[in-house]
Amino acid sequence: MNRNLLTVFAHPDDESMGMGGTLAKYAAEGVETHLVCASRGERGWFGSEEANPGFERLGQIRTQELENCVKELGMRGLYFLDYIDGDVDQADHAEAISKIVTHIRRIQPQVIVTFPPDGNYGHPDHIAIGQFTNAAVVCAADSSYQDLEDLPSHRVSKLYYMVDGENYINLVTPFMDEMDFPIVDGQQRGEVAWMEWMITTRIDMAEHCHTALRAIRCHESQLPSLGAIANMHDDAITAVLAMQGTFYRAFSLINGGREVESDLFTGIR
């Protein structure tokens, strides 16, 4: 049986900075890995305002960066929803859900990964695309739900949230002062670690972290957002990346219990 993994994120770089090692590992093992990206990152500029290439051009730059990244990670497919960076939470929810359902039914993944309810650090785009994806998983399995291409229903076996555990956050916190976390509705948002006991799945992908680092560096326009981490030695960065690979199993139709998984496809035959 072909194993298919679909990731659904908001911006170019979410995939590699969040789970690049995991994606590289599964691609190397022959899993078909796919990415649905909600936007093209048109507002993600971290340089001087004078050097800003502008809304449309930056979107083109980041699209090319993401295309280079998914090639580095060995991913099979890349698909854009073409919402505007920063406005994903304003998208028509029915339309967004239908778009994702169409991709789910076409790709037929056993496993989907998206953002947790807090969007990892409160970014409204992250939160929105996570909510849309949760709804799309339900709708994709409903034979009475008609998507944009009228495809047959598909039931996803497992849905995961990409999360950051306490150990990882404690390691990177000293570098976070230089990172820009969003202010939303007058409130400063930021990274909140998942307690280690909450993590249901830990993927050992350390040997693939140099691939993940090359993929991250494809997002050249975004490297300033990493602050001091971007200037660390490669071995130090890959050691940090190796502490990712932590996920929360939001639901599974095939397994459960407290035993920590070492594979997103545990129970799938």
Language model: regions and residue ranges:
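Metal-dependent de-N-acetylase/amidase catalytic core
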Residues: 2-4, 86, 92-269
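Active-site rim/loop-helix segments in enzyme catalytic domains that contact anionic ligands
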Residues: 1-108, 142, 236, 248, ...
